[in-house]
Amino acid sequence: MPLIRIRDVVRGYSETYTTEEYKSEYIVHENDLLIGMDGEFNIAKWGKTPALLNQRVCRLAPKDSIDKDYLFYFMPVALKRIEEKTPFVTVKHLSAKELNKIEIPVLPLEEQRKIAETLSKVDELIAFREQQLAKLDELVKARFVEMFGDCKTNPKNWKTKALEKIANVGSSKRVFVEELQDSGIPFYRGTEIGALAEKKAVIPALFITEEHYKQLCETTGKPQKGDLLMPSICPDGRIWIVDTDEPFYFKDGRVLWVHLTSANYNSVFLLYTLKDRIMTDYASIASGTTFAELKIFALKKCKVFDVPLELQNQFATFIERVDRQKQTVQQSLEKLELMKKALMQEYFG
């Protein structure tokens, strides 16, 4: 029988099994509400395959006066409040005592169902937009393979060059914690770079002074439009092609910087080449025990296809068309997410 661990709660299935005897009351069924009680306090509906409750996983069984879907939408608000108040050492822990103290606004059942139905419809629209983005990403991947083949196996037998032969590969100059400010020039970490790679709006949380920024630029230069930046922990290939002239700086080591030096390469082609290399062969490129990280020396050695620039430019034109579609979908998705936040605030405070 599958055994539910905390990591399984959100995804709704388990790949861990037990042969021990169990009581029927510990069996979790489809759509049962579960909460992970360590780390991030997530609530989710369980998937189709029955499984067993495990330690640090809590099942919620609402009473007759509470609609299950209403409870599902209310609980993230309550859990977030508890999480914010919970002391952080290494991993946050949620206690049964704290759960039992949660006060749930008990509205008439019909009203509860109406609230849950409204939020469910918004969730369906959000999921649809996310599926559209995923399909557009698949379209790009298919087009790349069609034109150039898989970067790992090179079925078209392109000649290759090490990345360091066509680009400068490095990072930034170190900025110390005490040098960070509450305003000024935005300072991006891997988290923000990853979000920008996904074309999400980023609100900077950290800054450096303009004077400090100028000093850093004199020492290391600054990213230009068309340069590539990526988080050092990047198994999903989140690479940002710089698309702004606005000043910013970034964290050394945690963000890698690629600046093309060859006129025979297109930045868009290079982005998707590295994305393909990283996503299909991350284990052999990255290093580290806890979190495998991309290192500058390894990135320099990455092999890049030596293909005609005309072909690269054709691919870049295709990407431009797809990106316009993605931007439209992404804007719609962000509006839906804002709508859901507003509704959650209206319903649950």
Residue map of PLM features:
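A short glycine-rich beta-alpha junction/loop motif
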Residues: 51-58, 75, 88-110, 248-256, ...
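Non-catalytic DNA-recognition/assembly elements of restriction-modification systems
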Residues: 9-11, 101-116, 128-173, 182-184, ...
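Short, solvent-exposed loop/turn positions at domain surfaces
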Residues: 21-22, 88, 127, 174, ...
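Short amphipathic alpha-helical signal-transduction/dimerization elements
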Residues: 75-83, 274-282
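A short beta-sheet element
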Residues: 5, 24-76, 189, 211-213, ...
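Sequence-specific dsDNA recognition surfaces
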Residues: 2-30, 164-179, 193-225
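ATP/adenylate-binding site constellation spanning eukaryotic-like Ser/Thr protein kinases
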Residues: 6, 96, 141, 160, ...
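Active-site/binding-pocket entry motifs
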Residues: 9-12, 41, 59, 193-196, ...
